[in-house]
Amino acid sequence: MATAPPPLAQVAAVSSAVGDDAYADVIGHCRTPVTNETRYTNAHETSHFISSALRRPGVNGFYLGNGQAILLVEPDVTLADVARYVRHRGWRFKTYFVEAWDDRPLYMLDEFTAYIWGATVAVQDAESGRRLERTDAVSGCMEFATYAAALAECVEAEDPGYWASKDGDALRWFLAAMLNRADRLFVAGLDVEAFKSARQDSFLARWSADMAAVNVAERLAGVAY
């Protein structure tokens, strides 16, 4: 069942990035954009800078696009708590769960958002015929979609008061929106030759065979606008 979006924060455009695609959007809304790497990497890293500018104690912010962002209050769980709900660990797990801020569980959504932005730019570039670098451009958003589902399971079980509150409503709306984006991007990029990788295929096979994990993601995604 669709839910109305929570109140969204506004992010002002701060540069005259040329174009009307996702790359121009994310680069144009950051005061210190990354522009010296590939377009995929630039979008990914610039998303982190926007999130950093939005972050404050106990609250994380994530850029959605078109000058809008969402601010989410941290639930009372740790990243280690979330890790216990992760059924299938991809190759990025250690970096973002073991070596990250344990007391900021929504930090992983900063990475999820960054992988979404990178994948969006990569898929748009593929569709427009741009020259593509060899990179697993869409596997990150797929891997983090499974971690986002684990986050939801964890918060629902470990902090039910948060899950039932307006803060929980906002988190569910955001997760649903991002899971839907991740699904569309992964499907769009799955058969792009430059994006293929053995690690991607292996992780997808393990995850898609686990119907319990798939059902959690589908239940969350069904809340999307």
Go through each PLM region and give its residues:
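Pan-zinc metallopeptidase signature
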Residues: 116, 120-225
